[in-house]
């Protein structure tokens, strides 16, 4: 039997201790040693044996990298990629390797996808060398993609009252939706981007009105 990593959450370190004991007992009954425990709570980790803890500072949850010390999430995979590319084939590789399920990095990745679409429209071959203008444009895009790994987003959003709002918009090149969570703590309200979706406009030209309707559609789907 193979058991991969599991992820869960509780409100307090006391509840975490109880869950740890229950999980250990349950898996031990099946002769499975549940180990490599990690948490953003130092108190919880101190209560458990050191042999059960992981030494890693960062972990992945559903493909999203998490820093347990700072309790932040970030996009991994762009800092070590080479953006010195000269062909469509080389440009597509770094763009496709950036994993961003929450689409929090859409402002940076959308420009890269639009660039790839432009190459297709111009019927560029896979290994055809970029023109000087395309090379300069890609250099700017690559710089923005490289910065993604340095961006840290708070994982925890506290509050006792919550409201979800979504905003949509469109241009001739793309349409998008952004979902914000408004939370209130002691009368102070904060807004955090929690999810977004951006799509490139089809190669067949559509009116701005239709693209705005498509933006409203994906915005509604984001909430449902």
Please name every model-derived segment.
Residues 37-60:
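Short, conserved micro-motifs composed of acidic
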Residues 4-6, 27, 34, 63, ...:
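Mobile genetic element proteins and their domesticated derivatives, centered on retroelements
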Residues 12-15, 54, 87-90, 159-163, ...:
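Secondary-structure capping and boundary motifs in well-ordered enzyme cores
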Residues 56-163, 178:
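C-terminal reverse transcriptase regions that engage the nucleic-acid substrate
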Residues 166-191:
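Acidic, metal-ligating active-site segments
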Residues 183-214, 218:
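A short, polar/acidic, helix/strand-boundary loop motif
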Residues 1-30, 47-49:
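Catalytic palm subdomain of template-directed nucleic-acid polymerases
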Residues 15-33, 130-159, 214-224:
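Inter-domain linker/hinge segments that demarcate the starts of reverse transcriptase
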